[in-house]
């Protein structure tokens, strides 16, 4: 019943603060995520190693999320900030996917040369290898905030759970599945 006690949102546009639902001073970022480029596991004959490779002869097809899903929005933002979005689109190299799992499936099956996904998804996929992280500053940070709800039926338990989320045990688990944990 933690969800009746705390609020955790991946989408920063969902601002429960304005709805006056969270206890003041309890909001914090649990973890952050990265955007990475992946290739089929054990198969990278063209030596793809950089996001910029997408507009070179190294890449025939790249899987990206549709523009209506977060991973697609981050991919577009990255390529726009690299000054390569228009060029990439004009080269007809993009295989669009409806979600990050579909991007992973296309890459793992070898249907595309590479794809753009979250590090957490890459870390839990057996079918891909990470070859690059998105260049620093090429997209807005991906953070997952949490806060204790004002109407928590058991605020002490909620506080204990939040303390657990901030602790070293949780940090190990989060790191193992590809999340970055904010430093204190």
Label each residue range with its predicted role.
Residues 1-184:
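Exported/periplasmic ABC-transporter solute-binding proteins
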């Amino acid at each position: 019943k933690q969800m009746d006690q705390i609020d955790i949102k991946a989408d920063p546009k969902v601002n429960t603060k304005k709805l006056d639902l969270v206890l003041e001073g309890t909001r914090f970022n649990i973890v952050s995520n990265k955007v990475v480029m992946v290739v089929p596991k054990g198969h990278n004959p063209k030596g793809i190693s950089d996001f910029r490779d997408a507009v070179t002869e190294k890449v025939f097809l790249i899987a990206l999320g549709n523009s209506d899903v977060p991973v697609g929005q981050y991919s577009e933002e990255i390529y726009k900030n690299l000054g390569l979005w228009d060029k990439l689109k004009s080269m007809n190299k993009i295989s669009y996917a409806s979600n990050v799992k579909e991007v992973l499936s296309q890459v793992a099956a070898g249907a595309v040369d590479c794809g753009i996904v979250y590090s957490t998804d890459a870390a839990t996929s057996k079918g891909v290898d990470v070859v690059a992280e998105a260049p620093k500053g090429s997209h807005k940070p991906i953070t997952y905030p949490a806060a204790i709800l004002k109407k928590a039926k058991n605020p002490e338990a909620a506080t204990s759970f939040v303390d657990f989320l901030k602790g070293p045990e949780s940090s190990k688990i989060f790191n193992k599945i590809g999340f970055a944990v904010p430093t204190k």
